[in-house]
A protein has these predicted regions:
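Conserved P-loop NTPase motor cores
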Residues: 1-9, 14, 22-32, 49-50, ...
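Conserved AAA+ ATPase small/helical "lid" subdomain
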Residues: 179-200
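Long amphipathic alpha-helices with heptad-repeat character
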Residues: 38-52
């Protein structure tokens, strides 16, 4: 999908190295390692920034003897004149976009499903840095499509126009609940897909 949708993904600057054409455990392991590396880099930036801030407070304090400043406060700081810079200017915001993977190992059932486990613990990957997971699929609950335990952990659902009432009943049964009744969900969906130029 990454190769065939290059024109679409070009606006979000997806690097070639960030595309995985063979969905499976190996790709997921590499992705989690990348998240952990981003988290380690961010933690190192935070550590350096805290040291730099502390050093600056001491340097600005007229009551502090400069010779008494611990030298370890300067260790690892690349530039004493300006604060350390983070890679993005903020904490990394990482996302995994899974597209056209229906029928692959990602959506197998069973307790050994690595992708299912990642979807459930995505907020805790990278020591809490997290990884948002976006799943694009054409079938809500067909065999080989998005597993029920993944759907039950979803926080958002973008649902396009669907004319098959059985499918809509299934979606409504899973998506309604505390905040919506089945009827309210179906009415909201009918309203949403009938408005404007978008049918979702």
């Amino acid at each position: 999908t990454c190769g065939s949708n290059k024109a679409l993904y070009g606006t979000v600057r997806v690097a070639e190295a960030d595309c995985y054409d063979q969905p499976g455990d190996k790709a997921l392991t590499e992705i989690v390692k990348e998240v952990e590396a981003e988290a380690a880099e961010w933690r190192e930036y935070v550590r350096k920034k805290e040291k730099w801030d502390k050093l600056q407070r001491l340097l600005r304090d007229p009551g502090v003897d400069l010779d008494a400043i611990p030298p370890e406060l300067m260790d690892g700081l690349d530039n004493l004149d300006r604060p350390p810079q983070s890679k993005y200017g903020h904490a990394p915001r990482l996302a995994l976009l899974v597209d056209d993977c229906q029928g692959t190992k990602l959506f197998t059932t069973g307790s050994n499903n690595t992708f299912g486990h990642l979807c459930i613990k995505h907020r805790h990957v990278g020591e809490g840095l997290g990884l948002s997971v976006f799943i694009l699929c054409q079938n809500f609950a067909s065999p080989g499509a998005c597993n029920r335990f993944i759907r039950q952990n979803a926080t958002h659902l973008m649902l396009f126009r669907e004319r098959d009432e059985e499918v809509m009943d299934k979606v409504a049964a899973e998506a309604s609940g505390v905040h919506w009744s089945r009827e309210e969900f179906l009415a909201a969906h009918r309203y949403a897909v009938s408005q404007g130029q978008h049918d979702f």
